[in-house]
Amino acid sequence: MLRTPVDFQDEFDVIVIGAGHSGCEAALASARLGCRTLMLTLNLDKIAWQPCNPAVGGPAKSQLTHEVDALGGEIGKMADRTYLQKRVLNASRGPAVWALRAQTDKREYAAVMKNIVENQDNLVIREGMATDLVLGNNDEICGIQTYFGTCFGAKAVVLTTGTFLGGTIWIGNKSMPAGRAGEFAAVGMTETLNELGFETGRLKTGTPARVDRRSVDYSKMEIQPADEEVRWFSFDPEAWVEREQMPCYLTRTTPKTHQLIKDNLHLSPIYGGFIDSKGPRYCPSIEDKIVRFADKDSHQIFIEPEGRTIPELYIQGFSTGLPESLQLQMLQSLPGMEDCVMLRPAYAVEYDYLPATQCYPTLMTKRVEGLFSAGQINGTTGYEEAAAQGIVAGINAAKFAQGQDMVVFPREQSYLGTLIDDLCTKDLREPYRMLTSRSEYRLILRSDNADQRLTPLGREIGLIGDRRWALYQTKQENIAAEKERLHTERVKELDPLGQKIAADTGQKIKSSVTLADLLRRPKFHYADLASYGLGNEALTQAEQAGAEIDIKYSGYIKRQQNQIDQISRHANRKLPEGLDYLTVETLSMEAREKLNKVRPLTIGQATRIGGVNPADINALLVYLEVQHRQKNAQEAVTS
């Protein structure tokens, strides 16, 4: 750790350390808000690289991607420009869990993002390893020092170090210092953070082998085609690129696969005891799956292309830390892969992280003013989680550098806010992945209305320009007008059209109904209205969907909003000091144990305890109300 005065080679408003998905969003946000920004990366040729699965979106992750775009970020636009395949997951379920997922072209994605950051005003990109922080007399950030001794000044620094901080990759019992295969680990910064009193820990993740597509027999696999109708992450049509899509394929593990793994578990880094870092619960290695789900005869393995012009296939669901000599045998035990050629081995990577309870919800650290952290250093896993934190850290680093109030994203207004609230308030000791179940407000926090929730804020912050703002206003006006039309126009029982709709749907029309009434019926959608000539062809698909969802789910949405309002109203309600939570049978067992251990003072504090979900809070409020009424009744009797 260095102290001022220091001879700075150059001075900036904000320095971002790292150029992955978090670093790029942070640097772009800072620069676009008028701050002279430096983005420091270990490798200028690997900006926005996708070292694991080259994909964007999926359950909860797509909501984050839409939200970053709604604020003015890039990840959604990147996916829309470079996708190989797109599919909507959970399409048969409700809109709260609809999830767009795009397989992306790995090299194209990185090249397009590199071009964007290289041509961004106010943004300087430089290759180098930051190893130390420069602090002022009051322990405030003043800059950074690189491995070779060069110092750069800054009012704010954002750490987005990914898996590089103290990174070690493992294949079997062999290891080497690296942030990912073929790239240096970052050294020095962990020691600086420890010296400043920060707690750091170790986490692990992994990536599967890559296989030559020319050596795979797809006829033995199940094709996974793209959706015919392409959907988009970005709310900006200028980012939409119609392109030919590529299929993915599905194969499965076999008894031979399972036996190979069971016989050699002792050779894996975790089961062999070479490392003891926690890996991601929701993205386990294949050996973890075999151990944890021993009763399963087979596991799905998805075969996904990494690009249009490269032969590499990503073997999703098959990450491992087992020795390289075993990996080819394991791969060749999969149907369609009997003669496959392995181009890159799978490996596990262990790295340092900074538990995010040491951060404010602005992502500025509590110990050092002007120091922010975002992405995997905060204990998360996934490009989307990283990008979401990156744009928040970039916004707030810029605000801090400019002496303005920083922005806090409430959990009830976005998945992004839920993510950061969880990170900053819960003691998480394993890589955190965003899930729809983590949000108690998921019916309100949908992908389709991310712009409605966050674009006005993006405009206020300064990341949404006039063109995007005009697009947003037009869309919202069109949805509002269409909802009014649907609530006004009616179909009569005795009209030929009314009789046809009744016959087709098997549901009678009594006297007359509005078009909104029709939309509220199960399995009746806007496309059905359109088929009867009752739709509005001038609207975009997104505008039609927005109007339909608001009408069809209005009762559920209102109920959830009431729950939000109720919990908000009761946030400061004090909890009885002597309350024995273990006796409150309407609480889940996990909630009883956590509440009894933590002993929160208020309802608001209780909502932020890991393992206590919204249903538990509602049950607790009901319990307190019942106790209050019983107490009043007893007092009335005795008086």
Swiss-Prot record:
UniProt-listed InterPro entries: FAD/NAD-bd_sf, GIDA_C_N, MnmG, MnmG-rel, MnmG-rel_CS, MnmG_C, MnmG_C_subdom, MnmG_C_subdom_sf
First and last residue of the signal peptide: none
One Gene Ontology cellular component: cytoplasm
Cofactor entry: FAD
Pfam families: GIDA, GIDA_C_1st, SAM_GIDA_C
Principal localisation: cytoplasm
Subcellular location, record wording: Cytoplasm
Binding-site residues for NAD(+), renumbered to this chain: 279-293
Residues the entry annotates as binding FAD: 18-23
Superkingdom of the source species: Bacteria
Gene Ontology biological-process annotations: tRNA methylation; tRNA wobble uridine modification
Job of this protein: NAD-binding protein involved in the addition of a carboxymethylaminomethyl (cmnm) group at the wobble position (U34) of certain tRNAs, forming tRNA-cmnm(5)s(2)U34.
Family: Belongs to the MnmG family.
Quaternary structure annotation from Swiss-Prot or TrEMBL: Homodimer. Heterotetramer of two MnmE and two MnmG subunits.
Name this polypeptide is given: tRNA uridine 5-carboxymethylaminomethyl modification enzyme MnmG
Species assigned in the record: Picosynechococcus sp. (strain ATCC 27264 / PCC 7002 / PR-6) (Agmenellum quadruplicatum)
